[in-house]
Amino acid sequence: MNMVQAINLALRQEMERDESVLILGEDVGKDGGVFRVTDGLLDAFGPERVIDTPLAESGIVGSAVGMAIAGLRPVCEMQFDGFSYLMIPQLEGNASRYRARTRSQRTVPMVVRIPYGGGVRALEHHSEARETFYAFPGVKVVVPSGPRNARSLMASAIRDPDPVVFLEPKRSYRAFKEEVPESADDLPIGKAQVVRQGTDLTVVSWGAMMRPVIQAVEDVASARSVTIELIDLLTLAPMDAEAVASSVRKTGRLVVVQESPRSFGVASEVIAQVNDRSFLYLEAPVKRVTGYDVVTPYFGRENLYIPGVERIRNGIEETLDF
């Protein structure tokens, strides 16, 4: 099952389980979404629970906030990452604040699905990775890296009592398949996953970058006879900082890989958390392998912008050699 199918399965199962779950967004009904993630759900659940909306991102999320306050569990879809910025006033100004405003008497259980990132030969405002834009206090930010954890994290996001931004790496949608069990794994929001155990170096990444990172880690580990610990964050906010810090206390070295621009990104927060918790254990400067501080380029230059296996491998080797 690929990631599109896995997310579709999670949506279908959660809608069957809980009648308060509904879907709204641009073309999510009749067309099944721009990437067909909601394909077949209109036929299964009808137009009252799978709602096609106008092209108005702020209106979609604002409506979802009202639905959630009224007792529903809406899942909204933004067609592309670059269009999602229009809904930020609703996400930050209303959804993120409602628990605090009511002193936790009321919450806003809603999910905002956002296809994000490059690698699909699209325009720059269809290909951006700006994860930190959504990490307001009161909002949880989740990024799956494969079909199996996408299905489980979507179930956790829908059941969560607070607003969740569910970032879906577009180039992972149909890039590979995994066996997805009938029942979702117990994969709580806020918990990172150690993909590979090691003692010589820690590598941290998330989302679509996990595929080239795994390849680079395997290449270096094989060539150098070292063991490298690999952590998939899965949740960016709240970050499982202790999982990273405890790994660094064991390995003494850290490389963080992200697709987004170098400055003001999730990698910077990972490094700050490690400095707070494990600085005295570091045996080398922490390395960032990232995109560049430029507007996301057109698809003809994406291969230069998005970190590939070679750049990641070089970053790992430089850190090991320090």
Model-derived features: positions:
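Thiamine diphosphate
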Residues: M1-P163, L167, K170-F322
